[in-house]
């Protein structure tokens, strides 16, 4: 294992000397402006990829828009950074093949709208209110007139129907 001598640490057959005195002297001689550059030089290799980040904006190969942003480096090939085009909402890699990807692929979908009142309808038996809640059509019936005629009254006042986008009745 490792043993400690007055000269340094012996590890795997090699002696590592202590240089704490020389490091402290070097830190004292550096002005504060150079401390930031020393910290950058001593950073890990993951920070080096951030330094390689492209500075110039590259036009989108599909729509030729200059509204692109750098996303990250490709995991398989660091020489092909991944970009995102704000114009056509597609990802692309510089130097990579253009794939036939639909617009907005891989992006998060927006939340559906909240509760929206579609309309208020009336008929002979009672008042019918139609509302749209998260893509479902909901009908509320007030059964005052239906109960007065002696007909069967439902215990559940709300009735759910599927609403289709092609305009057919629900």
Swiss-Prot record:
Cell compartment(s), UniProt: Nucleus
GO CC terms, sorted: nucleus
Gene Ontology biological process terms, A to Z: flower development; negative regulation of DNA-templated transcription; negative regulation of stem cell population maintenance
Keyword check for Nucleus: yes
Keyword RNA-binding found: no
Tissue-specific expression: Expressed in the vasculature of cotyledons and hypocotyls, leaves and roots.
Pfam family, one: Zn_ribbon_Dof
Protein name (Swiss-Prot/TrEMBL): Cyclic dof factor 4
Lineage, broadest ranks: Eukaryota, Viridiplantae, Streptophyta, Embryophyta, Tracheophyta
């Amino acid at each position: 294992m490792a043993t400690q001598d007055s000269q340094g640490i012996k590890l795997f057959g090699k002696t590592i000397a202590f240089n704490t005195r020389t490091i402290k002297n070097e830190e004292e001689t550096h002005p504060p402006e150079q401390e930031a550059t020393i910290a950058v030089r001593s950073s890990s290799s993951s920070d080096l990829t951030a330094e390689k980040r492209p500075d110039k904006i590259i036009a989108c190969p599909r729509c030729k828009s200059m509204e692109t942003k750098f996303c990250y480096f490709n995991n398989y090939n660091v020489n092909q950074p991944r970009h995102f085009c704000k114009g056509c909402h597609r990802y692309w890699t510089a130097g990579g093949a253009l794939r036939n990807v639909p617009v907005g692929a891989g992006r998060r979908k927006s939340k559906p709208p909240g509760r929206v009142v579609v309309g208020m309808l009336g008929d002979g038996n009672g008042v019918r209110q139609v509302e749209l809640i998260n893509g479902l059509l909901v009908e509320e019936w007030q059964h005052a007139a239906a109960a007065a005629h002696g007909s069967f009254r439902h215990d559940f006042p709300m009735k759910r129907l599927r609403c289709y986008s092609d305009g057919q009745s629900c």
